Amino acid sequence: YAAQPEWVRLRDSYAEAAGDDEYAGKDLRIAVVRAMLADGQGAAAEDFFFAHCQGKVGDADCAMLIAGHYKAKKDAVALDAFAGKVSLRYDSDTQKVKSLTK
């Protein structure tokens, strides 16, 4: 277990600590997404986002991290696909993510 990447440990600790409270775990959700992206795991970050972040407090932060990651890598296909699926707590936040595709 110790040989696993940091994001795996963070993801697993989130899974153990997560409840149904949309406010709880915001910082840990952001930390999980950051660690996944730092390890080049964009697909894993998206999976985690859609399973645990979207619709909860901090979802815009997580979505912008993922979208920004794709933009920095100049991966327009992944960015467009992600932005097309995102639906955040606030429409204005959703539009911020979509604006990165331009």
What are these regions (language model features)?
Residues 1, 74-77:
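Short coil/turn connectors between adjacent alpha-helices in alpha-solenoid helical repeat scaffolds
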Residues 15, 30-34, 50, 64-68:
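Amphipathic alpha-helical repeat scaffolds
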Residues 7-19, 41-54, 76-89:
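Alpha-helical repeat scaffolds
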Residues 7, 21-31, 56-65, 90-101:
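Generic helix N-cap/helix-start motif at coil->alpha-helix transitions
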